[in-house]
Amino acid sequence: MIDFDGYRPNVGIVICNKVGQVLWARRFGQNSWQFPQGGINEGENIETAMYRELYEEVGLTKKDVRLLWASKYWLKYKLPKRLVRNDASQPVCIGQKQRWFLLQLVSDESAVNLKTTKSPEFDGWRWVSFWYPVRQVVSFKRDVYRKVMREFAAILLNETRKGETERSVLEASDKREYQRRETRKSARAWNHYPKGK
C-alpha cells in the first residue's frame, strides 16, 4: 500500500529492556542493523500492524511487552534512488512514512525469536545503549531515528525515574518494617531480662 505521495505507511518498533537498552537487529544476510519495522496492510490499524510486525520480525507477542508510548505523528524518510523500485505494474515507492512505538520487554529475553516466518527479516540481535542506533543506522534513516529517540527519551526517562521511585519507596518501606521488627525484638528481650533484686 503506497500513498498518493509515494510513501509506504509503516510501523517502527523500539523495544527496551529494564535498564534502558534497546533491541538492535541485524538484517538477514547483511551487515546492516536497524529497529524492527514493517508495512501496514490495507484495512489494518496501526497498533494491529505493530503487533503483527513485532511477532513476524522478533517473535514477541502482546503478552511479552508493555506499550509505553506511540508517536503521534508520521515521520518520513526517502529512499536513495538506487533503492527505489521502478515497476510499471505498481506505484513507485519513494520512501516510508512511519508511526513509531516504544515497548518494554516484560518477558525473559529468551522469548525473542527471529525465525517465526519462512523469510526472516533479521539473523541476529543484541542490546545496545539508547542513543547508539542514531549514529549507526543507515544514513537515509538517521533523521527519523534522531526524532524518534528524542521523543522516546523523555518517556523512558520518566519510566526509569518511576521505577527508581517505586524501588526507593519499597526499600524505605522494607527498612522501616525491619526497624520495627528489631525494635519489637529488643523490647521483648528487655522484658525477659531478669530484673535485679
UniProtKB/Swiss-Prot annotation:
Disulfide bonds: none
Annotated InterPro entries: Nudix_hydrolase, NUDIX_hydrolase-like_dom_sf, NUDIX_hydrolase_CS, NUDIX_hydrolase_dom, RppH
Keyword Hydrolase listed: yes
Highest taxon above the source species: Bacteria
EC number annotated for this UniProt entry: 3.6.1.-
CC cofactor: a divalent metal cation
Keywords, alphabetical: Hydrolase
Entry's transmembrane regions: none
Name by which UniProt lists this protein: RNA pyrophosphohydrolase
Organism: Haemophilus ducreyi (strain 35000HP / ATCC 700724)
